[in-house]
Regions:
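Formylglycine-dependent sulfatase
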Residues: 1-168
Length: 168
């Protein structure tokens, strides 16, 4: 299940369906779709998604407003826990890298937590913590990385990271 774009690939992976069977619009997952999060949770696994969501409401206000808020909410995707970027509206997504806007288990992380930090590090640390907390139980982790495409921004290992001001 792979497509030339990240969103159709992620929906295929999570639903097990080809895109002609699950497509309702770009950046949207049908709110009635059952994901592997549901299946794993129903079968006794502790489940986590940590990384990119971007499947609830992709369109900006001035671009196809009729498709806003039609996708699946992260809270309804079948996972016990989540730590995701772009959980809701496009205009609220901010940077996915430096100073990211991250929605974790029903609350946005505060700037005190995210300021100066790198999104992938926050996601990875949450995954490691989840695995430690659930090491005695069967668990399932889905890590849809945000690093797969543009915008290309400095990483914590680059000299430019300290002075880089990401879009908000």
């Amino acid at each position: 299940h792979a497509q030339p774009l990240c969103t159709p690939t992620r929906i295929q992976l999570m639903t097990g369906k080809y895109n002609f069977r699950n497509y309702i619009g770009f950046g949207l997952m049908d709110p009635n779709e059952k994901t592997f999060g549901h299946i794993m949770t129903d079968n006794g696994y502790k489940t986590l998604i940590s990384g990119k969501w971007q499947l609830y409401s992709y369109n900006p206000l001035d671009e196809m407003p009729e498709d806003r808020n039609k996708g699946q909410k992260i809270e309804d995707a079948g996972f016990d826990e989540f730590c995701v970027w772009h959980a809701h509206q496009t205009e609220e997504k901010g940077s996915r890298y430096k100073n990211p806007i991250i929605y974790q288990n029903g609350e946005y992380l505060t700037k005190e937590i995210t300021e100066g930090n790198y999104g992938e590090d926050i996601f990875s640390e949450y995954i490691l913590d989840f695995m430690d907390r659930n090491s005695d139980d069967p668990f399932f982790v889905y890590f849809p990385m945000t690093l797969t495409h543009r915008p290309l921004e400095p990483t914590p290992d680059s000299e430019e990271f300290a002075i880089f001001d990401p879009p908000s």
